[in-house]
Amino acid sequence: MSDTLTADVIGRRVEVNGEHATVRFAGVVPPVAGPWLGVEWDNPERGKHDGSHEGTVYFKCRHPTGGSFIRPNKVNFGTDFLTAIKNRYVLEDGPEEDRKEQIVTIGNKPVETIGFDSIMKQQSQLSKLQEVSLRNCAVSCAGEKGGVAEACPNIRKVDLSKNLLSSWDEVIHIADQLRHLEVLNVSENKLKFPSGSVLTGTLSVLKVLVLNQTGITWAEVLRCVAGCPGLEELYLESNNIFISERPTDVLQTVKLLDLSSNQLIDENQLYLIAHLPRLEQLILSDTGISSLHFPDAGIGCKTSMFPSLKYLVVNDNQISQWSFFNELEKLPSLRALSCLRNPLTKEDKEAETARLLIIASIGQLKTLNKCEILPEERRRAELDYRKAFGNEWKQAGGHKDPEKNRLSEEFLTAHPRYQFLCLKYGAPEDWELKTQQPLMLKNQLLTLKIKYPHQLDQKVLEKQLPGSMTIQKVKGLLSRLLKVPVSDLLLSYESPKKPGREIELENDLKSLQFYSVENGDCLLVRW
């Protein structure tokens, strides 16, 4: 085995037949002669053992089948950053042009060159590069010092995800030469991060840093971003992060923080990042979050936490209590929320009901699940909410005369916006509360006539359809019934309460309830 292998090979990232691994051992493995590398695979199913052979432990793996012994000549140790860029971005000239001889003068001496035009063209191509994508290109190091800065001075965005980089120091050696670097993605590199302090200003103009699936800890995050004084977006998906301390002098400029798929995070840890002054977007999808409380704010008050938070994403979690959304009403700047695939929101038949309840619970919300909340939808949601819980309000001490209101604390806690809705729309009348409550009718059936204005020979039908049924599903039903492609169908409706007015059902994702379709209305079908 060569001296190079023994000197610096341990800890290096390597690629073998498309699979990535980390070198854990270099040496002889008796009784077979010659040098071997012991590697731990990223995919443990690729290995054969745990680093042992015939009773001798040569290295240790996290998984019992995560290790293998491989000959050094079978392993790809990767390439340097600049070579990878040239391989990917430099256009090769034809063979004849490459061989063209030229005489150039350097100083006072004439020098014969071959392919001088080609070299100049390569340098021109590289110097113009601003965005570089080197995903899965086996980049393992920076290469010759100063080479990147000289060849590619204008790079602003680099994707180095899924390469063979083994340490944050190596990332810095690359980034240090890119003085205009604003976006850096090193996801899916198993990086060793520094344990000591990091020099500030290393990534002085960096705005976006992506560290998904790198194995970084929260303490390491805080050390690394100390070198990014202007950082605006930080992505930390799938790192098993536990937020262990409050950021004090770092992350103060961050506007977007993605903590998706970090299953160790809970609401107590979120308090540690709750005072980041510029944080506008927080992504907590697939973290297992089920509850959130802002104890500093009482009923009807705003919290001092997350002062700038405008957009919260909590998809794929365990949210099962409506109190979660009551707490979000306390966030002073919240305008957009995404909460798909949670126990409270994932049932198709209840999706419209859940949407209306969330809208009624969070007064300042403008967008829910990437769908704009129009004024008429908010009005309907709030009126339905006021009506649905009207009897409960009365039983809890509610009264049309505000001076006679004696609402229980339990009701105010469960419905913190109800009093405001009574002020906005008036208290519910007794006659309103005698009818069936719309929000409680999960499967309310509407009896509708179905007519075909352009097909006069078609018989008028009468169908019972759930009010929560989406326009898309209504079209699917009619498509099967009429043997007409869904894409050809245009739907509208008319109501005896609105004579002479036809209302288009143009959004396939909305329900019949959304368009205020009621019993006795008539669907108009055209194709």
Swiss-Prot record:
CAP-Gly domain: residues covered: 27-71
Effect of I155N: In PEAMO; decreased function in the organization of microtubule cytoskeleton and mitotic splindle
InterPro entries: CAP-Gly_dom_sf, CAP-Gly_domain, LRR_dom_sf, Ubiquitin-like_dom, Ubiquitin-like_domsf, Ubl_TBCE
Residues found modified as N6-acetyllysine: K463
Keywords annotated in UniProt: Acetylation, Chaperone, Cytoplasm, Cytoskeleton, Disease variant, Dwarfism, Intellectual disability, Leucine-rich repeat, Neurodegeneration, Phosphoprotein, Repeat
One GO term describing the cellular component: microtubule
N-acetylserine modifications at: S2
Modified residues (Phosphoserine): S495
LRR repeat residue numbers: 154-175, 180-200, 205-226, 230-252, 253-274, 278-299, 308-329
Alphabetical GO biological process terms: adult locomotory behavior; developmental growth; microtubule cytoskeleton organization; mitotic spindle organization; muscle atrophy; peripheral nervous system neuron axonogenesis; post-chaperonin tubulin folding pathway; post-embryonic development
Segments forming domain LRRCT: 342-384
A single MF term (Gene Ontology): protein-folding chaperone binding
Main location: cytoplasm
Assembly information from the UniProt record: Supercomplex made of cofactors A to E. Cofactors A and D function by capturing and stabilizing tubulin in a quasi-native conformation. Cofactor E binds to the cofactor D-tubulin complex; interaction with cofactor C then causes the release of tubulin polypeptides that are committed to the native state. Cofactors B and E can form a heterodimer which binds to alpha-tubulin and enhances their ability to dissociate tubulin heterodimers. Interacts with TBCD.
Family: Belongs to the TBCE family.
Disease linkage: Hypoparathyroidism-retardation-dysmorphism syndrome: An autosomal recessive multisystem disorder characterized by hypoparathyroidism, intrauterine and postnatal growth retardation, psychomotor retardation, epilepsy, microcephaly, and facial dysmorphism.
Role noted for this protein: Tubulin-folding protein; involved in the second step of the tubulin folding pathway and in the regulation of tubulin heterodimer dissociation. Required for correct organization of microtubule cytoskeleton and mitotic splindle, and maintenance of the neuronal microtubule network.
Protein name: Tubulin-specific chaperone E
Annotated organism of origin: Homo sapiens
Taxonomy of the source species: Eukaryota, Metazoa, Chordata, Craniata, Vertebrata
